[in-house]
UniProtKB/Swiss-Prot annotation:
It holds the Pfam family CarS-like. This is CDP-archaeol synthase. It is found in: Cell membrane. Its EC number is 2.7.7.67. The keyword Transport does not apply. One of its GO terms (molecular function) is CDP-2,3-bis-(O-geranylgeranyl)-sn-glycerol synthase activity. It is an enzyme of class 2 (transferase). Catalyzes the formation of CDP-2,3-bis-(O-geranylgeranyl)-sn-glycerol (CDP-archaeol) from 2,3-bis-(O-geranylgeranyl)-sn-glycerol 1-phosphate (DGGGP) and CTP. This reaction is the third ether-bond-formation step in the biosynthesis of archaeal membrane lipids.
Length: 175
C-alpha cells in the first residue's frame, strides 16, 4: 500500500502552481476541484508513489518475510509490476480528487472536514485502480482480512500525517 499512501502527502508538500481544474467552475458556480489539486502536486505525488513501490520491491527481495508474515508483492516483476505500482499511486490521487469534486458540490471549502471520507477516499481509489489493473492479483493480495486491516489502520495513519503536516506548516488544518 505504500504506493497508495505516499502520493497525497507528497502532493501536498511539493504541490502548488496551476490547478488541475484551471480555475473553472461548474454550473453551480463552485470550483470543479479547487486550488488544492495542482498539476505539480499530481505528478510529484505520482513520482513518489512509484518510487515507494520500486523501493518496496527491492526490500521484498531481501526481506520477503517480516515478523513471520510473508509480505505482499506486486506480481512477478516487469511491466505487470510497474502497472500495479502506478495503478495504486494514480488511483490514490484520483480517489482524493474525486472526493474533492464531491466536497465542492456539497459546498464544502478546501480543507473542510468530511469524516471517514477524507480518510479513505484515496484508499478506495487505489483499490479500484488496482483491481482494474489486475483482478487476479487484487484477489490474491487483498483478502477480506487485509482490506479490514487497511480500513482500520488508514484513518489513524491519515490523522497522524495530517497533524505532522499541520505542525510543519504544509496543512492549514490538522485533519
Amino acid at each position: 500500500m505504500l504506493p497508495a499512501y505516499l502520493p497525497n502527502p507528497f502532493a501536498a508538500l511539493f504541490g502548488g502552481g496551476r490547478p488541475i481544474d484551471n480555475g473553472k467552475t461548474m454550473s453551480d458556480g463552485r470550483r470543479i476541484l479547487g486550488d488544492g489539486k495542482t498539476y505539480r502536486g499530481f505528478f510529484v505525488g505520482l513520482i513518489f508513489g512509484a518510487l515507494a513501490g520500486l523501493m518496496q520491491m527491492q526490500l521484498l527481495e531481501k526481506y520477503p518475510v517480516l515478523f513471520g508474515v510473508e509480505l505482499p508483492t506486486f506480481g512477478t516483476g516487469g511491466s505487470n509490476t510497474t502497472i500495479l505500482i502506478f495503478a495504486l499511486a494514480v488511483g490514490s490521487l484520483f480517489g482524493d480528487m474525486f472526493m474533492s469534486f464531491f466536497k465542492r458540490r456539497m459546498g464544502l471549502k478546501r480543507g473542510a472536514p468530511l469524516p471517514v471520507i477524507d480518510q479513505l477516499d484515496f484508499v478506495l481509489g487505489a483499490l479500484i485502480f488496482a483491481y482494474l489493473a489486475s483482478p487476479v492479483w487484487f484477489a490474491e493480495q487483498f483478502t477480506f482480512k487485509v482490506i479490514a486491516v487497511i480500513l482500520i489502520i488508514t484513518p489513524l495513519l491519515h490523522l497522524a500525517t495530517n497533524v505532522v503536516g499541520y505542525f510543519i506548516g504544509v496543512k492549514k488544518e490538522p485533519w
